[in-house]
Amino acid sequence: MSLELPVFDISKPLSESSLTSLQDACKEWGFFYVTNHGVSRDMYKKLRRFSTGVFELEDEEKMKMGASNYTPRFIASPFFESLRVSGPDFYASAKSSVDAFSDQATDEEFSGLMKEYGEKMTKLCEKIMKAILSSFGDDLHHKYYESEFGNCHGYFRINNYTIPSDQEDDHHNGDEQDLIEGLGMHTDMSCITIVDQDDIGGLQVRTRDGIGLMDINPKDEALVVNVGDLLHAWTNGRLRSSQHRVILKRRGFVGNRFSLAFFWCFDDGKVVFAPDEVVGGCEGMRVFRSFKCGDYLRFRESNEKGKFEKVGDTVEDFARIEDRR
């Protein structure tokens, strides 16, 4: 079943009613769409073209990029591989990935494109975060944006999901049990994540009761935004970091899936602790203990590798005060 999420024109300040809708979407689902975001389809197509050339290389060549730049299959999923480009110097990060196997002209064009994309997405995250803070009222974005989110940084993953050829023959039966998880159920380790997915779709979010799954379909000219664990904790649990997954195979269609996911995070040294004004909206009960962002990221990384069929540990496991469940 498809989930109808609100769509926000992020090119202009949101009205009071739109801010209310934004707050409601973040509380109920932790997902929404944005339009007029400044990232053109032409840029997306160029990124896909360059990245496809990299993904088509032999595994031995791709592994030369190193573990910090390339995630091969069977780390997060047997069907998933990704390139990582980290800010704030997106150019240098991209260049370090492809230096090993590309010519200088291709290297510079690829790195320049990654730099442009990373900088656009960083500015977009800043704009979205200010809107989310404004949705709380009380001028929260003026009070806390610079002090709490001013040092946030971003990185993005270029994701390639591949259907195994030995599972392509039986896809016409429409059997829900025959679906393949390209990436298993998880939450994001970010403040916010922005996803640009192709027209194949496959993104699903788990309902609050933990029973159902809803499709978040691609929407023309729109990007998907979701709340991550760090913002979930910073808002004392008021905004939802939802469990979600990616499906590769569904009812009569088989193909590769391509997406760009930009993760906007606190710096590693940031102590995550909900402000009193935010806690007050939860009847004054503090739900999460304070924690250092880098400690949480290391906790997640140590608990996720190779566990394809398990929902990874989240900030709920790491920092929630036990008697507040």
Swiss-Prot record:
It is an enzyme of class 1 (oxidoreductase). Keywords: Dioxygenase, Iron, Metal-binding, Oxidoreductase. Transmembrane segments: none annotated. It comes from the Eukaryota. Highly expressed in elongation zone of lateral roots. Disruption phenotype: Longer root hairs under Pi-deficient conditions. Fe cation binds at H186, D188, H244. Gene3D superfamilies: B-lactam Antibiotic, Isopenicillin N Synthase, Chain (2.60.120.330). Binds 1 Fe(2+) ion per subunit. 2-oxoglutarate binds at R257. Residues 152-266 form the Fe2OG dioxygenase domain. GO terms for biological process: root hair elongation. Belongs to the iron/ascorbate-dependent oxidoreductase family. GA20OX subfamily. This is Gibberellin 20-oxidase-like protein. It comes from Arabidopsis thaliana (Mouse-ear cress).
